[in-house]
Amino acid sequence: MSCVPWKGDKAKAESSDLPQAAPPQIYHEKQRRELCALHALNNVFQDSNAFTRETLQEIFQRLSPNTMVTPHKKSMLGNGNYDVNVIMAALQTKGYEAVWWDKRRDVGVIALTNVMGFIMNLPSSLCWGPLKLPLKRQHWICVREVGGAYYNLDSKLKMPEWIGGESELRKFLKYHLRGKNCELLLVVPEEVEAHQSWRADV
């Protein structure tokens, strides 16, 4: 199964009185070039100044082959399409860690109150101007809670996509994790990772 746009409870949500438009306090960084990793990080921190392209490029150049978690997925120098190694190192500069989620586990055991946000890597359609090409490429997106609700802050979206509460979020995550080539990172404070308190079953 390939990853396709989330539809889940969208129809139900659209017919309800729950808000669909993004409240003004949500920071949603839009896609520029191949900088989806940068956008996902800034959207997680809800801060346009959390990271810059230059910051991520410095981190990438600092990482040696011996420290690469997945050396076969290295970013091409300077193109901005950074891999998980750069994301993990960038988070560590802010006192956070990325927990790579084992897709065999039930997302129901995630202690959501201890997770700041989620970064997902999933296939996304390529576009040439207004044209959508019949090709897919891996893409980083951010999902996080703002104002008591969870939102998909994919930088390719025109505006944040409302997901809903905790149960809707878990459905969203399950749906995408069933797909091929979809991965999930939990963004948590260092102390949460150290004590594994992102798990509700410990």
UniProtKB/Swiss-Prot annotation:
It catalyses: Thiol-dependent hydrolysis of ester, thioester, amide, peptide and isopeptide bonds formed by the C-terminal Gly of ubiquitin (a 76-residue protein attached to proteins as an intracellular targeting signal). This is Josephin-1. Gene3D superfamilies: 3.90.70.40. One of its GO terms (biological process) is proteolysis. Interacts with beta-actin/ACTB. GO terms for cellular component: cytoplasm; plasma membrane. Its EC number is 3.4.19.12. InterPro entries: JOSD1/2, Josephin. Residues 23-202 form the Josephin domain. Keywords: Cell membrane, Cytoplasm, Hydrolase, Membrane, Phosphoprotein, Protease, Ubl conjugation, Ubl conjugation pathway. It comes from Mus musculus (Mouse). GO terms for molecular function: cysteine-type deubiquitinase activity; deubiquitinase activity. It is an enzyme of class 3 (hydrolase). Residues 1-22 are annotated as: Disordered. Widely expressed (at protein level). The lineage of its organism: Eukaryota, Metazoa, Chordata, Craniata, Vertebrata. It is found in: Cell membrane; Cytoplasm. Its main location: membrane. The active site is at C36 (nucleophile), H139 (proton acceptor). The modification Phosphoserine is found at S15. Pfam families: Josephin. Deubiquitinates monoubiquitinated probes (in vitro). When ubiquitinated, cleaves 'Lys-63'-linked and 'Lys-48'-linked poly-ubiquitin chains (in vitro), hence may act as a deubiquitinating enzyme. May increase macropinocytosis and suppress clathrin- and caveolae-mediated endocytosis. May enhance membrane dynamics and cell motility independently of its catalytic activity. Monoubiquitinated. Ubiquitination activates deubiquitination activity in vitro.
